[in-house]
């Protein structure tokens, strides 16, 4: 569960290292974001010569959470850290060309098929 002020790792090569959630998109009083939800983030730590810099406000999709996701068969997939992939603000396509770490099958949809295809492992 990601809410405002939550810190996340950037799971791509966009240049951001850590980001902070500043808004959960999709409803006026929506409080929590789960895997596959789009959030608004600000870059808190970035590497030199990256595509984004510290202070940039971007959209991002949550790909890993400590809370995890429950499958219809009753199993739960949890991760050690919260992580997201930064998106272009207008097209909502990933900024980076590589994805680091596993992503879940819940991202398989029309919107995020690119992220699933770039990921090294889909759980």
Curated annotation (Swiss-Prot):
Cellular component aspect of the GO annotation: cytosolic large ribosomal subunit
Superkingdom assignment: Bacteria
Entry keyword Ribosomal protein: yes
GO BP of this protein: translation
Keyword RNA-binding: yes
Alphabetized Pfam families for the sequence: Ribosomal_L14
Keywords for the protein's UniProt record, in alphabetical order: Ribonucleoprotein, Ribosomal protein, RNA-binding, rRNA-binding
GO molecular function, one term: structural constituent of ribosome
Subunit and interaction comment: Part of the 50S ribosomal subunit. Forms a cluster with proteins L3 and L19. In the 70S ribosome, L14 and L19 interact and together make contacts with the 16S rRNA in bridges B5 and B8.
Protein task: Binds to 23S rRNA. Forms part of two intersubunit bridges in the 70S ribosome.
NCBIfam families: rplN_bact
Family statement: Belongs to the universal ribosomal protein uL14 family.
The protein, known as: Large ribosomal subunit protein uL14
Organism annotation: Vibrio parahaemolyticus serotype O3:K6 (strain RIMD 2210633)
Gene name as annotated: rplN
């Amino acid at each position: 569960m990601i809410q405002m002020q939550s810190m996340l790792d950037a799971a791509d090569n966009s240049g951001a290292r850590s980001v902070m959630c500043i808004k959960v998109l999709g409803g006026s009083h929506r409080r929590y974001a789960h895997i596959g939800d789009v959030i608004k983030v600000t870059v808190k730590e970035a590497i030199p010569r990256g595509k984004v810099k510290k202070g940039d406000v971007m959209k991002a999709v949550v790909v890993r959470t400590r809370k995890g996701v429950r499958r219809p068969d009753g199993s739960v997939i949890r991760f050690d850290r919260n992580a997201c992939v930064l998106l272009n603000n207008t097209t909502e396509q990933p900024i980076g060309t590589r994805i680091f770490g596993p992503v879940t099958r819940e991202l398989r949809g029309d919107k995020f098929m690119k992220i699933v295809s770039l990921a090294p492992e889909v759980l």
